[in-house]
């Protein structure tokens, strides 16, 4: 037990001695740094043996170009930092003052920019690698403080985040010109829609409702199907035949030829008088005909004739005076065409028959 306590005490003494030596070394180190605060020694260029002598002065020109490049890079870095510091300031007054005032250049900022922003390092520091870096005595650059987004959006020359606000166009393009008096009165009554840009007078959309189509109450009346509408102007009103003026069908007891005119003298169309003006039409079926050329027998021709008679009778019973008038006019026209030119008659009759069968016209 005694040996263990002796060993522990000896180890504790050794640790204390080591700590004292470390503290003494730390106190000596800053003293040496204070002694070495002086400028680095200037190294003179050794005289060459004649092998690398600049006979034409090329070395001097290269040194001058390097110095010019260093000065140019310094000025560029200064302008960039000044622009950034102006943009991220918080007060509007300081921003305006800095924009209006010329940029200030000082030797301290040039030195710091040259060391921190890629400027050229002196040759003495490059050659003497063992030398410690000299602490800069210039004050540090002021830290940039970011302004809030609201402040940046309200600052002049910057675009706001909200594109829908009307102040965006004013800041971007300036104040729009005043609206003429002639347009002010129209704009009060008609819907106004803004133009594509914030400049220029507003476009006035004309109301698409036609004023001359409105009633006294301001409503658009419904027009009947018999009224022709041509570009907003009321067209021809077709006359309607009242049901009292229409004569009864031929199957009801009175024929078209013997019936008297029941139309009034008010200009209403009289179908019976028009039927009397037409030449009489004989609806008959010829038995026989060209059955031999077509290869049909007499029995087939008789069946076809009976079917035609039935269809003609059905049409006559179901038709009115209007249908009879239209049919008689068509048949009379075909007869005149046949007497004039048979080729035209065959072409027209075939086209007419195809239309009748296509649209199922009775």
Curated annotation (Swiss-Prot):
Transmembrane segments: none
Comp. bias intervals (Acidic residues): 51-70
Database matches in InterPro entries: F10E9.3-like
Biased composition (Basic and acidic residues): 12-23
Biased composition (Low complexity): 100-112, 153-167, 241-265
Region of interest called Disordered, as start-end residue ranges on this chain: 1-117, 153-172, 210-266
Superkingdom classification of source: Eukaryota
Name listed for the protein in its UniProt record: Uncharacterized protein F10E9.3
Organism: Caenorhabditis elegans
């Amino acid at each position: 037990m005694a040996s263990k306590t002796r060993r522990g005490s000896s180890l504790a003494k050794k640790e204390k001695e080591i700590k004292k030596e470390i503290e003494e070394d730390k106190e000596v180190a800053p003293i040496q740094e204070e002694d070495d605060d002086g400028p680095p020694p200037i190294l003179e260029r050794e005289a060459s043996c004649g092998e690398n002598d600049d006979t034409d002065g090329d070395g001097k020109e290269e040194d001058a170009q390097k110095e010019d490049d260093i000065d140019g890079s310094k000025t560029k870095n200064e302008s960039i930092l000044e622009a950034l510091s102006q943009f991220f300031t918080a007060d509007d007054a300081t921003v305006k003052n800095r924009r209006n005032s010329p940029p200030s250049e000082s030797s301290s900022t040039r030195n710091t920019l040259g060391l921190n922003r890629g400027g050229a390092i002196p040759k003495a520091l490059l050659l003497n690698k063992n030398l410690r870096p000299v602490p800069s005595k210039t004050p540090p650059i002021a830290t940039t403080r970011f302004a809030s987004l609201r402040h940046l959006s309200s600052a002049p020359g910057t675009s706001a985040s909200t594109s829908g606000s009307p102040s965006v166009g004013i800041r971007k393009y300036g104040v729009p010109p005043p609206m003429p008096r002639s347009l002010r009165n129209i704009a009060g009554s008609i819907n106004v829609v803004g133009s594509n840009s914030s400049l220029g007078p507003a476009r006035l959309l004309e109301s698409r409702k036609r004023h001359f189509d409105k009633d006294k109450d301001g409503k658009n009346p419904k027009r009947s199907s018999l009224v022709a509408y041509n570009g907003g102007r009321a067209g021809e009103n077709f006359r309607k035949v009242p049901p009292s003026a229409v004569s009864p069908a031929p199957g009801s007891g009175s024929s078209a030829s013997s019936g008297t005119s029941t139309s009034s003298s008010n200009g209403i169309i009289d179908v019976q008088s028009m039927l009397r003006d037409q030449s009489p039409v004989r609806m008959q079926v010829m038995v026989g005909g060209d059955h031999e050329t077509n290869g049909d027998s007499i029995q087939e021709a008789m069946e076809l004739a009976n079917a035609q008679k039935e269809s003609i009778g059905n049409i006559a019973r179901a038709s009115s005076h209007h249908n009879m008038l239209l049919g008689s006019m068509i048949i009379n026209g075909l007869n005149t065409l046949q007497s004039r030119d048979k080729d035209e008659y065959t072409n027209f009759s075939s086209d007419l028959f195809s239309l009748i069968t296509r649209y199922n016209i009775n």
